[in-house]
Regions:
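Short active-site oxyanion
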Residues: 1, 30-33, 65-67, 101-105
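Short, well-structured N-terminal submotif of metal-dependent ribonuclease cores
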Residues: 1-35, 47-58, 128-130
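Conserved glycosyltransferase catalytic-site signature
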Residues: 7, 73, 92-93
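Acidic, metal-associated active-site segment
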Residues: 43, 90-105
Length: 130
């Protein structure tokens, strides 16, 4: 089953965060993942800022083992419509539009995706539960 794991899921998995075990099953098979280039941007920027460029490039090598989806005019326009409809930021709208366009589930722990169609939402509130 193909899925799109949001940037927050990649970061949880890469840093062995508290929710990493919830994201790991979705990231186990890189070839079944869809990764829009805007997600690569977010991930590279975060890893380079928080760690270093060498590790950021290693993470990009991982994402390049997935099905990388470039930004097209059709995706940009669809993302704009979704942004207006759901009040999503630019990158979040592109990520959601990519998942919807390719008919895959978006897996995320970002609150603004909760309740949207075709989203597997992993709530952060699990962090405070025993």
């Amino acid at each position: 089953m193909e899925v799109l794991v949001d940037t927050c899921g990649w970061i949880e998995w890469l840093t062995d965060g508290i929710l990493s075990d919830r994201f790991e099953p979705f990231l186990a098979d890189l070839q079944s993942l869809i990764v829009p280039t805007c997600l690569q941007f977010e991930l590279y920027k975060w890893v380079k800022r928080e760690r270093n460029e060498t590790l950021a490039m290693e993470v990009m090598a991982l994402t390049n083992q997935t099905q990388v989806i470039p930004l097209t005019t059709a995706l940009a326009l669809y993302a704009a419509d979704l942004s207006l409809a759901h009040r999503l930021s630019f990158a979040d709208a592109l990520i959601y539009a990519t998942a919807r366009h390719y008919e895959v589930t978006l897996v995320t722990s970002d609150d603004h995706f909760a309740g949207l169609a075709d989203v597997t939402y992993i709530p952060k509130r699990l962090l405070s539960e025993p």
